Amino acid sequence: MSDLLGILKQQGQSEEFDAIKIALASPELIRSWSYGEVKKPETINYRTFKPERDGLFCAKTFGPVKDYECLCGKYKRLKHRGVICEKCGVELALAKVRRERMGHIELASPVAHIWFLKSLPSRIGLLLDMTLRDIERVLYFEAFVVVDPGMTELERGQLLNDEAYLDAMEQYGDEFDARMGAEAIRDLLRQIDLEDEIRNLREELPTTNSETKIKKITKRLKLLEAFYESGNKPEWMIMDVLPVLPPDLRPLVPLDGGRFATSDLNDLYRRVINRNNRLKRLLDLNAPDIIVRNEKRMLQESVDALLDNGRRGRAITGTNKRPLKSLADMIKGKQGRFRQNLLGKRVDYSGRSVIVVGPTLKLHQCGLPKKMALELFKPFIFSKLEFRGLATTIKAAKKMVEREESVVWDILDDVIREHPILLNRAPTLHRLGIQAFEPVLIEGKAIQLHPLVCTAYNADFDGDQMAVHVPLTLEAQLEARSLMMSTNNILSPASGEPIIVPSQDVVLGLYYLTREKVNALGEGKIYSSAQEAQNFYEAGHLDIHAKIKIRMPKEDGETGYHLVETTVGRAILAEILPKGMPFDYINRTMTKKVISKVIDSCYRKFGLKETVIFADQLMYTGFKYATRSGASIGIEDMEIPDDKASIIEHADNEVREIESQFRSGLVTNGERYNKVIDIWSRTNELVAKSMMSKIATEEVTDAKGNKVRQESFNPIFMMADSGARGSAAQIRQLAGMRGLMAAPDGSIIETPITANFREGLNVFQYFISTHGARKGLADTALKTANSGYLTRRLVDVAQDVVITEDDCGTDTGILMQPLIEGGDIVEPLHERVLGRVVASDVYIPTQTEPVVKAGTLLDEEWVEKLEKHGVDQVMVRSPITCQTRFGLCAKCYGRDLARGHLVNTGEAVGIIAAQSIGEPGTQLTMRTFHIGGAASRATAANNIQIKTKGVIRLHNIKTVTHENKNLVAVSRSGEVTIVDEFGRERERYKVPYGAVISAQDNSPVEAGQVIATWDPHTHPVISEVSGRLKFVDLIDGITMNRQTDELTGLSNIVIIDAKQRSAAGRDLRPMVKLVTDEGDDIYLAGTNVPAQYYLPVDAIVNFEDGSLVGIGDVIARIPQERSKTRDITGGLPRVADLFEARKPKDSAVMAEVSGLVNFGKETKGKRRLIINVSEDQCHEELIPKWRHISVFEGEHVERGEIIAEGALNPHDILRLLGVGALANYIVNEVQDVYRLQGVKINDKHIEVIVRQMLRKRVITFAGDSKFLVGEQVEESAMLQENDKLLAEGKQIARGTPILLGITKASLATESFISAASFQETTRVLTEAAVSGKVDELRGLKENVMVGRLIPAGTGYTYHQSRKAKRARVAAGGDSSATHTVTASDVEHALSEALNADNHEH
C-alpha cells in the first residue's frame, strides 16, 4: 500500500508547465467550474452576519466561512473533513476555498459579451460581416435581423425595423425567421461554417483589386482562421451562463456602526441577478412583448456593466456618483491586477529608514541600526537561541528577544556576520539602485551609507530614505554576495566607466592636497622617501603644498631610484597607491576627471580588489584633507571684477546707438532685437572672463622676491576648478552679472540683469528672474514623469532580450567610423569599437596579413593597435544584425560593460539597455528650442576652415572648373575630408551645391586654411557648360519682373509665382537654356541631357537673354527663406520621438529609385517630379510647391538621396537605404541628445532597442505559407514557418523588415501576458482569447507574473536544466524523474495492494 501513497504524493507536487493558453469559455466549461447557481441577490443576513442561502455569499455554493465548520454548527472539527451537513448543505473544508470556488448565474436570455462586441475591431461584427451599429441595434432591441430567410427575397443578416418586419410578416407569413436580441446574433454566429467561409475568402482574395476590400477580407480571414485553429466556437461570444467570482475576491466587510464596506462587484452582480429573476418571472407570466424586450435590454446592459463598466453608454455609478469598478477595471491600469499584484509585490523581511553618511565604512559595508537588525533577523535569532539551548520553545525565544537580553545581542552579531543585506533607494532607475552590503550594527535609528555609492543610488543626505531587504535562502545570499555586492559594481553598465568615483568633499580634499603653492614652507628640499616627507609635514616643518624632491623607485620594471619633483601632498597621496602603479598618475593636481581616470586605469591594470581598496583609501584621504583645508565660502570670496562697470557702460552705449538707428529706419525691429541680444550675450561673456581671471589667479612673491601669478586658493574657485561643486556659469551669477533671462513664452527678454547676487537684485530684476526659476521647477516635475514613462516603454520592448547562445555565426555587422562633426572628432573610433567583436578581417594597405582577425573581441590593447596602424573603419558585430532566433548571441553583443569581459549567456541585456537609456532621462531637458535668442543662434556657416594639417580628399563631389581655375561643386551630397599622414580621417565637412573649392583633390593643406566658400543665403544655379543663354517662357510682366535695386541701381530679373500670374502665364514653365551661337542645344558632358535649368519662384537671374556664360558661372540665384525655420526638438521629447519612430512633420523627400530627374506637369499646388530609371520605367513623386527641391532637371540621383530638404523619416531610411543606415541614424541622433547633456551611453544599448523595433516583417510573397501578403509577422515566426516549408520542399514566404515604435512593438509582442500588462489590456486580452493564443513564457515579465524564476541570469541555467531533464524523461532515459500518473495506474496499484492483503489473510 505504501507505494500507492508514494504515487499519490508525487501527484500532489507542484505542477510544471511551459506555456499558458487563453481561450473563450464555453457555457459547459463555465458550468463545470461552478459549485452551484446563485439564485438570489441577497448577500449576508444583516442581523446574524451569516451568508444567505443561494445568495452571492452562499456557504453551500462557495464553502464554509470558518475552517471545517458548517453554517448551522452541527459539525465542527477536522475529523469531519469532507462531510456535507444534512441541515445546511455546507461541505466542511478550509475557509480559503471561498477564494477559489466559483458560482454561476443561468441567464434567462442570452447576452453578448461586451469585449467581443465593442473592443475595436468588433469581433462579432467581423465574423458576421455586419457593422457594429447594426449589431447594437439588434442586441438592444431596436431592430429585427433576418436569421433564416427561407424561400423569401430577404437576405440573411438583413435588418428590418418594426414597420418593415410587419410588412414582411404580411407578405411572407411564417416563411422566414427574423428576431431581435442576442439570441438572433447567436443563431447567426452558429450558422457560420468556418471552413467554408475561409475557403471562399481565400478564393476571393486574388481576384479583388480594391485596396479597402483586400484589407477587409484579410482582416476577416485572419479572424476566421484564428477561430478555426483555436477550436473556439463563434457562438461562445454570446453568453447563456455568467460565471460568478469567488466571494473572498469580492469581500463584504462589516464596519463598526452597522455599515458595510463592499466591493463594487457585489453591486454589479446584484443588479444582474435582480434583472435576471425579474425577466424569468415575466417570461413565466407570458408578459407583453414590449415589457420582456425592455427587461432583456436591461439585462444586457447590466451584464455589460459587470464586465466592463462604461464601455457602452454611461457608466453605472454607485451611491457617491463614482463609476463602479467592473471586472475589466480590476485588471487594467497601474492599480490593476497586472501591475499592482503580479509584477510588483510587497515583500516581508524588509524595513526602511533615513540614511546618513558613513565616512568610516568600507565600500562593502553599511551601518544598520540595531533595532532594525533585531526585527529583520528575528527568525534567525529564534533558531540560534533554540540551537544553543538558551530557549526551549520559539515562544520562550520570542520573550527573550522582546526583553532584549544581552545574550540576544551576541547572537545577533553572530547571525549578521557575512549575511549580506540589500539596500534600495526609490526611484530605482537602473540596476545599481539595489546593491548588497554587509551590515555593521550601529546605535541610533538611521542607516549609514558609504559615500562612494551615492552616485549610483543618486542619493544625498538631505532626508532621503532607503529600504533594507534580507535575502533569506542560501542561493539568494550567494547571488547577493557574488553579483550585487557594491564592490562588484564598480563600472557602470551604461558606459563601462567607473561609477564609484569620489565627488564633492572628497574631490575638494584631494585637489587641495595635490595643489602647488609658490614659496611655501620647505620649498626645494630633498627627501629620501615619501614617508620621511610625511613625517616632516606632521611635525610642522613643511607646508603641504611645498614643491620638494623625493627619491622614488623607478617604474617600468627598472631597478634603482630617481629623484622626482613633486609636492608634499602628492607624496602623502603616493602612500595609498596600489603597488606597481606609476607615481606620475597622481603627480599632478587631482580634479574629478583625473581621479576618475586613475580609478579606471587601476581597475584595468590591477583588477577589482585593488581598486576597491584604493577607492576607499582615496575617500578617507579626501575627507581628512578637506577638513584640514578649512575651505569655506565667504562673501568676500565672490570678487567682482573692477572693469565690470565700464564693460556694461560700453554695452549700454552700443544699445543706444542701435535704438537710434531703428528710430531713423535703418534697421528693422527684428534686426534691432537680435543685435541687442547679441551685444548683451557678448558683454556677459566679457564680464565673466574678467571675473574668472580675477578669481582664478592671485599675485604672490616667490623665494627670490619676484612677483609671480599662481592659481588662486580662493575656495569658490577651488570648488569649481576641482569639479567638486559649482561651475563657471554659477560663479558668473554670483560675482559677474546674471545676464539675459527668458520670458514665459521662451523668448529672451532684451533687458539683461546686470547685477549679480553679491550686489543684489532690484525689484525689476528680481521679477524678471522669477519666471525662469518657476519654469525650472515645473519642468523638473514634468520631466520625471515623462522620463519614467519612457523607461517603462523601453523595458517593455526589450524585456525578453537575453543572451541565449555564444555565436550565431553571422558574418555581417555594421561599419564603425569615428564620429566627426565639422572639424571635431566627437567620438574617436577606438572608443566606439571598444568591447565589440570584429565581423570581418581588418587590413591595412602595407600588409597582406590582417591586423585583426574576424571574431576578435577588441579590448584596450587591440584598440591601441588599431589606433597605431591608423585604421579608420572597422566592421563590427552588432545586436541589430544578430541571427539568433530568440534573444541574442554573445559575439554580436560583445563585452559586458559592467564586468569588462565577453558577456555571459543568460545576461538580460535588453533590460540593461532600457535602464541605461532611461536612467539619464531625468537629466535631459524637456524643451523644444526655438530658433532665435542667444542660446541657439548659430550664424549661418559660409566657409570651411580646417583645423589640422593634412591632405584634402573630395568624396562624391561633382565639380566644374571655373575659368579662374577654382573648382565649383555641382553635386549635393558631397563631402570633403582631411586625412593625416597615416591616411586617418581627422575632419569631415559637407560641401553644399555651388561652393567654390580653393584646393585640389589630394593636395596638402595647412591648419587654418579656408578651403571652400559659399553664400549661405542663396541657392545658386551653376552652368556646367559654356554657351549663350537663351530664355524660354521668360516673358516680361507675365512670368518675370524686372526689379531695380535702390542702392546699386542695377536691375534684376525675378520669376513671378504661378498663383500671381495672369491666365496666360499659368502653364508656362520659365527656364534658361545654354545654346551655341547657331542656337543648337548644348548637352551636358557625356550625356544626352540638354543644358537647361528650370527656374523656381523668386529666382533672380543674373544674365540677360543671349549673353555669354562661362563654365561655373552663377546663372541665377534662389534666395533662401530663413523664415521657415523648424523648431528643433531637443532633450527627452526628441529621444521619445526617435524610439517611437514617429514620422516628422514635413519630412525630407528621398529618391525612391536611382535615375535621371525631370519635372512633369504641375498639379494643384504640387510639382510632379519624375525619376526615369530606364526607357520604360519611371517613378513619380508629388511635392508641394513651397518645399525647396534641391535637384535640377536632368540630374542623376541615387536611391535614398534627398530630393527635398527636411527632417529625415526613419521609415524611409529603412526602406531605401537598409537596416545599417537606419541603425546608424537612430544611434547617432539619440547619442546627440545625450552628448549635449554630457551623458555617456554605449551605442550597443541603443542598438538592442533598435533590434526590437525591427522584429516584424511585412510579408511580400506568401509562397505556400499560412501567411497573407501584407501581414505583419514576427521574424522568428516567419523563419520557423520557412524551416517547416523547406523541410516539406514547398515555397517559402518572403518579407521585408518594418520599423515599429517601441509602444507598438511592445503591444505586438508574441507574449499576450506581457502585452496585456503593458497597455490596452482589454484589446490585447480580447484578441488573444479569440485566437486561442499560447504564451510560451519566453520573456522576463511573463515568468515574474506566473511566479517562476526569470529565464535570465542564474534563472537561465535553471530553466535550461529543467527543460533538459524533461526532454530526458520524454525520451525515457531518466526514470527517477517525476511520473505522470494516470487513473489506470492508480487502479492497477490499488488492485495489486488489495490482492496482496488478501494473500496475507
Swiss-Prot record:
Sorted alphabetically, which Pfam families does this protein's record hold?
Answer: RNA_pol_Rpb1_1 (PF04997), RNA_pol_Rpb1_2 (PF00623), RNA_pol_Rpb1_3 (PF04983), RNA_pol_Rpb1_4 (PF05000), RNA_pol_Rpb1_5 (PF04998)
Q: Which cofactors are required for activity?
A: Mg(2+); Zn(2+)
Reactions catalysed = RNA(n) + a ribonucleoside 5'-triphosphate = RNA(n+1) + diphosphate
Q: Any idea which GO molecular function terms this record carries?
A: DNA binding; DNA-directed RNA polymerase activity; magnesium ion binding; zinc ion binding
Q: Which GO terms describe its biological process?
A: DNA-templated transcription
- EC numbers listed for it are 2.7.7.6
Keyword Protein transport tagged: no
> InterPro entries from the entry?
DNA-dir_RpoC_beta_prime, DNA-dir_RpoC_beta_prime_bact, RNA_pol_asu, RNA_pol_N, RNA_pol_Rpb1_1, RNA_pol_Rpb1_3, RNA_pol_Rpb1_3_sf, RNA_pol_Rpb1_4
Tell me which SMART domains the record gives: RPOLA_N
Q: Which residues cross the membrane?
A: none
Q: Any idea what job this protein has?
A: DNA-dependent RNA polymerase catalyzes the transcription of DNA into RNA using the four ribonucleoside triphosphates as substrates.
Which NCBIfam families would you find in this protein's record? rpoC_TIGR
| Family per record | Belongs to the RNA polymerase beta' chain family.
This chain's protein is named DNA-directed RNA polymerase subunit beta'
Q: Which organism is it from?
A: Legionella pneumophila subsp. pneumophila (strain Philadelphia 1 / ATCC 33152 / DSM 7513)
